[in-house]
């Protein structure tokens, strides 16, 4: 069944950045398709965007397009992007384009092709309010019910979900329920029950929880290499190795040794050969060390000496050379830690299995509502 007459929709929002909204979108979309549904996707408003076929597209829309081989036009998947300086132009009256009309036009065209639309928001409910396109505004514009995604704990996710639900309700948007991500079920198996009871006091159904998985919070070395686009000095022994943590090593070697943990990716100036040598030797002395580094991101554009480079190769440790100071390089690494990329096949498969095995997909589908007739 396709066409606007039968199309239904869901809007997936979050309580903030990096709460797991895109992870949930990806997993749910896969689950919808697994049920044989002709599902379509749209990210109505995007803040972080790239160019695909000379057309700007939000990064999350690009991810979904790449993972699921979506054939809809890029402009439908990502109708509105917010580039740098755009907010100022809107406030100063320099933007006259009807952005809401672009979003509705994309919805109408997608609804003609698909029987179910998954709409993904940007950040918390109020993001975009400055230009009149907050998540609450957009959900109201599209007439879509909202599912709110938050992350682990008890008090904080409930507080955040209730706060965001209030803004959606103020715009007349139905809050269909909530999903809580990164829940430590092994440590606190009672959390789902407490979350369900806590949210029920505010009239918000808990639609499920997603257990914490390290691979979903930590990328592989291959993703770091691809995302940083630096000069790879040595690939190391396993590009699919999962990074346990990121350590910035700008102190004396003995202090570094106290701070790095297992499977650490170490961001260190390339001219701190004392630090690099001490950490590299943890792989060369024939002993088992719990804090052996998984790899190096060398900042400052400083290439280590031939002697130290040979140590890295002998130890078979990943190393990439980056321009920029240590802070800016570490910030780039952090951005990569919290994003999913089309090339990360292992992580994507884990997401699909986690969502299908943890959430009641039929119950979530029951929350979908018809796309309004325009």
Predicted regions and their residues:
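Non-catalytic interface/targeting segments
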Residues: 213-274, 337-374
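Gly-rich Lys/Arg/Thr-decorated short loops/hinges at beta-loop-alpha junctions or inter-strand turns
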Residues: 82-91, 118-121, 141-149, 258-263
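N-terminal phosphate/diphosphate-binding loop that engages ATP/GTP or pyrophosphate donors
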Residues: 3-15, 19, 23-102, 106-109, ...
């Amino acid at each position: 069944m396709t066409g606007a007459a039968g199309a239904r929709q869901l809007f997936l929002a979050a309580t903030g950045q990096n709460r797991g909204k895109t992870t949930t979108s990806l997993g749910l979309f896969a689950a919808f398709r697994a049920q044989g549904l002709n599902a379509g996707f749209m990210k109505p408003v995007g803040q972080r965007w790239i160019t695909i076929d000379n057309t700007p597209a939000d990064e999350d829309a690009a991810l979904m397009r790449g993972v699921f081989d979506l054939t809809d036009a890029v402009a439908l998947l990502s109708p509105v992007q917010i580039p740098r300086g755009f907010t100022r132009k809107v406030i100063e009256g320099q933007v006259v384009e009807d952005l809401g009309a672009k979003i509705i036009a994309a919805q109408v065209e997608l609804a003609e092709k698909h029987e179910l639309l998954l709409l993904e928001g940007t950040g918390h409910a109020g993001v975009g309010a400055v230009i009149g396109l907050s998540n609450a505004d957009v959900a109201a514009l599209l007439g879509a019910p909202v599912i709110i995604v938050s992350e682990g704990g008890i008090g904080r996710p409930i507080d955040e979900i209730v706060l965001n639900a209030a803004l959606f309700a103020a715009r007349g948007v139905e809050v269909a329920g909530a999903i809580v991500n990164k829940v430590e079920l092994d440590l606190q198996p009672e959390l789902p029950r407490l979350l369900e009871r806590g949210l029920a006091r505010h009239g918000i159904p808990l639609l499920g929880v997603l257990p914490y998985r390290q691979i979903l919070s930590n990328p592989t070395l291959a993703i770091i290499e691809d995302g940083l686009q630096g000069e790879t000095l040595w690939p190391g022994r396993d590009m699919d190795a999962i990074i346990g943590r990121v350590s910035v090593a700008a102190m004396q070697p003995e202090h570094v040794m106290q701070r790095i943990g297992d499977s650490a990716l170490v961001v260190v100036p390339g001219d701190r050969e004392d630090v690099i040598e001490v950490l590299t030797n943890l792989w060369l002395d024939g002993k088992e060390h719990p804090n052996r580094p998984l790899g190096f991101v060398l900042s400052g554009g400083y290439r280590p000496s031939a002697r130290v480079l040979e140590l890295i190769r002998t130890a078979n440790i990943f190393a990439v050379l980056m321009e920029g100071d240590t802070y800016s390089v570490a910030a780039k690494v952090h951005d990569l830690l919290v994003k999913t990329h089309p090339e990360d096949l292992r992580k994507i498969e884990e997401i699909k299995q986690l969502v299908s095995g943890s959430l009641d997909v039929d119950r979530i589908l029951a929350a979908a509502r018809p796309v309004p007739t325009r």
